[in-house]
Amino acid sequence: MGQKVHPNGIRLGIVKPWNTTWFANSQEFADNLDGDFKVRQFLIKELKKASLSRVVIERPAKSIRVTIHTARPGIVIGKKGEDVEKLRAHISKIAGVPAQINISEVRKPELDAQLVGDSIASQLERRVMFRRAMKRAVQNAMRLGAKGIKVQVGGRLGGAEIARSEWYREGRVPLHTLRADIDYATSSAHTQYGVIGVKVWIFKGEVLGGMPIEEPKADKPKKQRKSRK
């Protein structure tokens, strides 16, 4: 059976940036990695209602800098910045070094795979029909300029006895093209029948990296030979 490689992992360093950027020696590496995991888990739990897209972690000179990408920055910041200050203090306690928090707003949540997946999962938990939730997400993404989108759900759909998976696609989703900017994310819906998994692929266009593109040269018209009389 053909298996698919992770669309984000294969594009790291080509069109996708890393979510964690730091260097450490062998003694500190495990502690930093464990700290990053705990910080991410804490933020996912705390900012469940803030439409959290992704968390980028940097570690410059014995400190930690966390960039939170969210569609609702107001919820993260809180009244007069109280909530973000609590987050900063807790992250500093987890990491054991001074922490700095930056907040980046996601302008188009309909084109962010993680936010689309979380939205579908939330609808499934509220007993919305899975086909309706999938089609609505696909239509919104295409309306806002996506080149293609694919949504897949799997589990006991509609409370069925036998689990199955269904998918819906519109436009192009070229997984084999490395320069294709494909946003991929997963989410899960906890329903009374069990867990339903959600996968989302969004194709936003091709990244050509500033390389000059040579246009095909037009063929020169051939000279017609004069016939001998």
UniProtKB/Swiss-Prot annotation:
Cross-referenced Pfam families: KH_2, Ribosomal_S3_C
InterPro entries per UniProt: KH_dom, KH_dom-like_a/b, KH_dom_type_2, KH_sf_prok-type, Ribosomal_S3_C_sf, Ribosomal_uS3_bac-typ, Ribosomal_uS3_C, Ribosomal_uS3_CS
Top-level taxon of the source organism: Bacteria
Cellular component annotations (GO), alphabetically ordered: cytosolic small ribosomal subunit
GO biological process entries: translation
Subunit structure: Part of the 30S ribosomal subunit. Forms a tight complex with proteins S10 and S14.
Assigned protein family: Belongs to the universal ribosomal protein uS3 family.
Protein name: Small ribosomal subunit protein uS3
UniProt source species: Photobacterium profundum (strain SS9)
